[in-house]
Amino acid sequence: MSVLTKCSLVAVVAATAVATSASAALVAGWTITTAFPTGAGNVPTGVTYTVGAANEGLQTTGSELRSVHSLAAATYTSPAGNGSQYAFSSNNWSTGDFYEARLSTLGYSDISISWDQTRSSTGPATFELVMSTDGGANFTTLLASYTVLQSGGGGAPGTWSSTTYNPIYSLNQAAAAADNQANVIFRFRSLATTAAAGSSRIDNVMIYSGPVPAPGAIALLGVAGLAGLRRRR
């Protein structure tokens, strides 16, 4: 295959990826833009903590991202996110504890969700994703079990950083049953009980209408540009 043909193929694939990204509408998204309180006596504790409404998207009114624990000793902090300034972290995990995103999808179809999640070395490694379309009265399972990778430490694929995005920590899931619903809940529920200090961290929780933008779409476009530059030379 000629260099020209290879460059042309890369450019076509990149253009397709960007076009797919552009066709997706962000209904609601949380990137955790505000630090949680710190210092002696100020760190949030208790059975629940919320970061409030989505800071991005077309349907943020009435939305909420929160964490719920069975132990009042749970603490909530905002360490570095996955390529963003902060993340939503908590410890003292018991089986059944969860993060959850609430929103309305009225007027939107082809719903899907993507999120970044990691843990400490002693944090819960297995979660499930369940969904409710009636405000929490009933739940259905979207992902029966998924593995959460450790951030940093021996054998870990990388450490979360506020300046570098690592797509290996990203997950996504289609949720067609959430189309055009007034009271949708996506719940990330722990399937394990861990040591008190074991933490789980979530970031970049995004609910889309339409295809989920590929994490590598922009990088691929950059590759296409570089290929074009080489061709002109």
List the predicted regions and their residue ranges.
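Bacterial N-terminal signal peptides that target proteins for export
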Residues: 1-9, 215
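Extracellular carbohydrate-recognition regions
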Residues: 23-62
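Extended extracellular/luminal ectodomain segments enriched in beta-structured repeat modules
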Residues: 105-114, 124, 181
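Bacterial N-terminal signal peptides
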Residues: 10-17
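Conserved Ser/Thr-centered positions that define the repeating blades of beta-propeller domains
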Residues: 130-133
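A short, hydrophobic C-terminal helix/tail in secreted or cell-surface proteins
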Residues: 213-230
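Terminal, low-complexity interaction segments
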Residues: 29-36, 122, 139-211
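Surface-exposed, low-complexity/disordered Ser/Thr/Gly/Pro/Asn-rich loops and linkers
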Residues: 54-106
